[in-house]
Amino acid sequence: VEAPLRSKSVSSQVNIPNTELEKASIRFAGDSGDGMQLTGTRFSATSVMAGNDVITFPDYPAEIRAPAGTLAGVSSFDLSISSNEIYTTADFLSVLVVMNPAALKMNLQDLEKGGILIINSDSFEKNDLRKAEYSENPLESGELNDYRVVQIPITKLTLRAVEETGLSHRDGVRCKNFFSLGVVQWLFVRSLDQTRDWIEDKFKNKPEIAKANVLALQAGYNYAITTELFQARYNVPPAVLPSGEYRQITGNQAFSLGCVAASLRSGLSLLYSSYPITPASDILHELAQYKNFGLKTIQAEDEIAAMSSSIGSAFGGVLAVTGTSGPGL
């Protein structure tokens, strides 16, 4: 689907109804290099600007640079959006977007029966299936009969959309996350304007990359309109929340602020000792910024040293904390 850089979305020839939902949950899943964290973050930002309350849950592979297409290398980003205040991610997904068979295998169990499953059909070749440990193609085996499956050749369509930019094949393929984002933004009645503006600001020093990502985004949006693959669009109305200034906060940031508050309220100085490991490293980085409150942070050489220094500090009379994640535990 061809789309100029600043073109308006094409008009739908069929009146596709808008279904109003109180809440919805979406997950983007693919290889750790497929940009799923970025895709989820941008859809979250768009949903916030639309007035929804939003809660997110990113998931990273524990392995360092797991082979592409394998189960160990799957990265995903969950978000739940609601017209009411929301406190936790949903137990089951309304929509699952998968970029390859490994992402499908690792995440399908979390999609509700009758949920929408958007699949990059270009990545279901024999070698892709083998790496994901599939003995037969799930697109043909009947395994997906309980879901509303939408197969889209995302890779091919992305390359076609960005062809005019002259990007290499590798760089062109990397834009496919924005194609999938365009599809989902159409599905949930979202404007592309904020995402376009963000792309152009983020890649202002690389105009060809900015143009390619915008083209892919618009192409995904247009594709969802023209192919009539979806029976309805879904609108989650704005949440009714008290007026005021709101901010985005991660669990790690909230935990860090909680540590500062606990230290101040208890009258005890705080020591946080840990070995860096994603995503727990953010706590160490965050607490290091609050040394004006008398906090001390230690970047230990390993997890055993982090635990030992925390235990020793606790015996020494301070409020001692350590943290880790995944294989560190």
Task: Cite the ranges covered by each PLM segment.
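Non-catalytic terminal/interface segments that mediate subunit docking, oligomerization
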Residues: 14, 28, 38, 239-311, ...
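Conserved beta-strand edge residues that scaffold enzyme active sites
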Residues: 61, 327-328
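Active-site cofactor/cluster-binding pocket
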Residues: 2-266
